[in-house]
Structure formats: structure tokens, C-alpha cells
Amino acid sequence: MAQESKPVEVSRRIKAPAAIIFKILANPPRHMDFDGSDMLRGAVLDHPISKVGDTFTMKMHRLGDDYLMLNYVVEFEPDRCIFWEPASGDPSRAEGNDPAKVGIPAGYRWGYILTPEGDDTTVVTEVFDFGRVSEEVHQSLLSGGGTWINGHNSMRESMAASLERLEKISTE
């Protein structure tokens, strides 16, 4: 049964053109530079996202565990929005994974909406939408004491930190 939950959204006005910000967001190797959750450890391949259907894999770390996360790009509008759906399971290891579900989108999305305000300012909204996940995935996201999702407080804080870091690297 899918969860009936509203997306978590955090916005920040950044004094940089949307094109500069989008170029960073569409480049997975740069994601670690602005990650406010401190979960990202780098991208597996060094290539930018260019369209819906692209995939990219990130090296992740959470609660003392290193793993890989395959992501499917599901929305891509240059200088306006980019969203991806992480897949279930770590394709690099068999233990703890249901082989039938590894690599299948888990039903939640991460993304960014860019709203230009003139030529040199952009409102960037980071979005985490877990409204389409199964109860099983929802509980999995809450595992580990809900360190980054339970009640959304720490998630909002890490999203705000991400946008603050994104601002810094967008204006260098």
C-alpha cells in the first residue's frame, strides 16, 4: 500500500543564473560537493545527465554502511527541473537483497526545481517525495532510528544545508 505523504520541500534564493546551478545538479560527480546529508561518497562514473532515462550510480554511506545507489532520471528540463528515482537494493552485493527487486525504482524521488528571478537569481527548491512508496520501502526508509527521515526535521536540515552548499559552489 502506497503512503499518503506530502513531499518534503526546502527552498533557497541563490544569486546565480539557473543555467549555472542546473549544470552542477546535472553532474553527479558534483553532488558530493553540496550534499548536506554527508551520505554521498562520489559518483561511480564521471558523466553528466542529459535526458530522461539516463542512469547514474552513487557511492553512499549511512549508519556505518557503504553501498551503491542506482538512480533513474525521471524528469529533465534544462535550467528548470531534474528528478531521479533511486532503485531498491545495492546491485554490488547479494546479501540482504531480494534479487527480484534490485535495480527496480523504489517509488521515491529526489529532485530540484529551479525558478529564475531575473537573469542572475534563482529560487532552488529541493524535493524529496516518498508518496508513492510501498509500506515496506517506507519502513526501510525509517530504519536505523529514522536518522534522516523520521519526522522530517533532520531531513529538512540536511536539505537546507545542501542548498546552502549549492549556493556557495554556484557563486564561486
Q: What role is predicted for each listed range?
A:
Residues 5-13, 18, 55, 68, ...:
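Intrinsic-disorder/low-complexity, polar/charged segments enriched in Ser/Thr/Lys/Arg/Asp/Glu/Gln
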Residues 13-17, 59-61, 87, 115-117, ...:
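Solvent-exposed residues in well-ordered beta-strands and their adjoining turns
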Residues 3-5, 51, 64-66, 103-107, ...:
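Short coil/turn motifs at beta-sheet boundaries
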Residues 43-103, 161, 168-172:
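Glycine-rich portal/gate segments that line the openings of hydrophobic small-molecule binding cavities
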Residues 10-12, 44, 69-75, 107-116, ...:
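Hydrophobic/aromatic beta-strand elements that line small-molecule binding cavities or substrate pockets
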Residues 21-25, 31, 56, 73, ...:
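Hydrophobic pocket/interface hotspot
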Residues 1-52:
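Hydrophobic ligand-binding cavity/cleft-lining segments
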Residues 92-160:
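Beta-strand/loop substructures that line and gate deep hydrophobic ligand-binding cavities in soluble
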